[in-house]
Regions:
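Structural transition elements
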Residues: 364-409, 430-436
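Long beta-strand-rich cores associated with HINT superfamily self-processing modules
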Residues: 557-584
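N-terminal lobe/hinge region of extracytoplasmic solute-binding protein
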Residues: 45-105, 232
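Extracytoplasmic/peripheral linker and loop segments enriched in polar/acidic and small residues
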Residues: 37, 187, 342, 354-357, ...
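Gly/Pro-rich hinge or "lid" segments in bacterial periplasmic/extracellular proteins
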Residues: 83-87, 179-180, 197-269
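Periplasmic binding protein-like
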Residues: 44-46, 123, 284-292, 426, ...
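Extracellular/periplasmic solute-recognition and catalytic clefts
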Residues: 150, 240-250, 271-333, 351, ...
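Surface-exposed binding/hinge segments that line
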Residues: 113, 130-132, 137-218
């Protein structure tokens, strides 16, 4: 899954990249808050640079920060991560369900039974059919976009001639398709137990049940794409205002603590205030002018020393290794010439960008692929890119880049002309740091004769770049495992059925053999052998230069003096927002 706050860090690192999160246990992830009895009441305020979050519809949320936020306050799922500090935070606990799922039939069948007393914000009882309907929505891929795609791949539903599911979602009236879906996702007679029939063994299917793609939605209240503006709550808070300036959540009177062992709502209101300048947000926290405020992203790299060198902020800051791999995603359809893709990698001044972002203290280390080292079982340096590779020079290997461009000049002249005259267009999220990093990148690429043009996107970044018709030549992107298996990294990023394949690599001559390897790895039930295959596929993806990897990172978080209960939540790579409280 991707991560919004880290996207800005990646923009700093590359002037165009992003990140994502995983369920990997982060060694040394710490709580910055002392053990103090939480207080109830007050308004908890989050300060955000962008005009709005990308999505509120639980079926469409796929960024770690927004998952952590919405699942803490509004969206209940069958299973949840335990909201506690340290490694235990990666453990699954029952949420809407009475347990963490019961597998059978070699993990091709999974059952979850709903706990009693759960309701929507209008008081309607949550039933199996509501969860079943929520699951059905993700098959309407022309309407419900941007969320995880695992259900479309794993559920035992027949495929149409074009390889897509015969079930097209609830907005298309097709009795046969609906029947096929309900055979794969069925409800018990008492409407409390939901059963999933899969087309393969998936031993960790219950980790997917922490996502909103498996959460209840009332069919009569579903407004398709517009449900994204005002989804119904099943958690302790509900939306009171969703405007251009703020998202305001208030207590949900229909929620019952007796039916929810995961959440304890402390503030009376939770507000995200949109459109704040990033420097202004940092100054608010530095000056403590809104002591109940939290920076919803990360502080600017230029302000990190102000937060982390001053002892008065000791209880208002965190600096953790994160499980994210940042990179630039090449749009292979727009950039089919591998020599130009390689030349961009070798001409990039990785050291200058890392130094600007804070070096190893704040930014992280040079990436060797897209599988994070924190995903220990599946990680190994690829030795194709980054440290350990023969041609990697942090400042840029300009002779190598120039030689590649010389080859491209005759091998792919049209692409060469685009790279040297028209310019390569790079999608980035709008940030004040671009004023500093664009000149670094522009000068670096120019050493190889490559011209770049940046495309800052101020709102709806992921919905924009995930649309093939709107994506530019490269896009700020990145990924971390959805849970502790690279089956949620390599296929998601590079397979035709992946939910976050920004590389558009299906027409690449190397793709067919690569996908064959992916399918073989996904069918493996021997975890050690599977790990070997994921490592090899990471190597192959780097050799194909479908992405330009940048760093394995670190993340910083800061907040006001009257915010308590802050700790780093391992599986989401963000603070556990639902545990925060106001101390005033």
């Amino acid at each position: 899954m991707s991560n919004v706050s880290a996207l800005r860090r990646a923009v700093v690192i590359t002037a165009a990249s992003a990140l994502a999160v995983s369920a990997v246990m982060v060694a040394g992830a710490t709580s910055a808050a002392a053990a103090v009895t939480p207080k109830t009441g007050g308004i908890l305020t989050f300060l955000e640079h962008t005009p709005r979050l990308d999505h509120y519809d639980p079926s469409r949320i796929y960024t770690g920060r927004d998952l952590a936020f919405m699942n803490s306050f509004m969206t209940r799922t069958l299973v949840a991560y335990n909201p506690v500090p340290g490694a235990a935070g990666a453990n699954l606990v029952p949420d809407l369900a009475t347990n963490t799922g019961v597998p059978s039939n070699a993990a091709k069948t999974w059952k979850f039974t709903l706990r009693p007393g759960t309701t929507f914000e209008d008081g309607k009882k949550i039933t199996c059919e509501d969860v079943q309907y929520g699951v059905s929505r993700v098959f309407a891929t022309d309407v419900i976009t941007d969320g995880p795609g695992y259900l479309q791949v794993w559920l035992d539903i027949p495929k149409a001639a074009d390889g897509t599911s015969v079930f097209k979602g609830p907005y298309v009236k097709d009795a046969a398709g609906l029947a096929a879906f309900k055979k794969a996702v069925s409800c018990s007679k008492d409407n409390r137990t939901i059963t999933f029939q899969l087309n393969k063994s998936v031993a960790d299917f219950n980790y997917l049940a922490t996502y909103g793609v498996i959460s209840p939605v009332q069919a009569k209240l579903d407004k398709g794409d517009k449900y994204d503006l005002w989804p119904q709550s099943t958690g302790p808070y509900k939306i009171a205002e969703n405007s251009k300036t703020q998202l305001k959540l208030v207590r949900n009177a229909k929620w019952s603590k007796a039916s929810d062992p995961v959440r304890t709502p402390y503030p009376d209101e939770v507000v995200i205030m949109f459109g704040y300048d990033e420097e202004v947000i940092d100054q608010i926290i530095l000056g403590d002018t809104i002591p109940t405020a939290v920076n919803f992203a990360e502080p600017l790299s230029t302000n990190n020393d102000k937060f982390f060198s001053d002892p008065k902020f000791a209880k208002q800051r965190m600096n953790n290794p994160d499980p994210y791999a940042r990179y630039l995603a090449f749009n292979v359809k727009a950039m089919p010439c591998i020599e130009i893709r390689q030349a961009m990698y070798y001409s990039r001044n990785a050291k200058a960008l890392l130094d600007y972002a804070g070096g190893s203290t704040y930014a992280g280390s040079y990436a060797t692929g897209v599988i994070s080292p924190l995903l220990a079982t599946d990680y190994a340096p690829t030795k194709v890119v980054g440290p350990g590779s023969a041609d990697f020079i942090p400042e840029g290997n300009i002779p190598k880049a120039l030689a590649l461009m010389e080859t491209a000049k005759t091998k792919c002249p049209a692409d060469y002309k685009k790279a040297t005259e028209t310019g390569i267009k790079i999608d980035t999220r709008q940030s004040v740091t671009l004023n500093d990093t664009i000149p670094i990148d522009t000068a670096a690429y120019a050493r190889a004769g490559i011209k770049v043009v940046f495309n800052p996107i101020s709102s709806g970044y992921y919905p924009t770049v995930m649309n093939p018709a709107k994506q530019s030549d490269l896009s700020a992107s990145g990924w971390g495992a959805d849970w502790a298996n690279a089956s949620t990294v390599i296929p998601e990023l590079f397979a035709s059925f992946g939910g976050f394949n920004l590389s558009q690599n299906g027409s690449d001559p190397a793709y067919a053999a690569f996908e064959k390897g992916v399918n073989t790895a996904m069918l493996s039930t021997d975890r050690k052998k599977q790990a070997v295959m994921w490592k090899a596929l990471d190597v192959q993806a780097m050799k194909n230069f479908w992405v330009l990897p940048t760093i394995f990172g670190k993340a910083q978080f800061v907040w006001g003096s009257q915010v308590g209960g802050v700790f780093f939540w391992v599986p989401q790579g963000n603070p556990a927002f639902g545990k925060m409280w106001v101390n005033n």
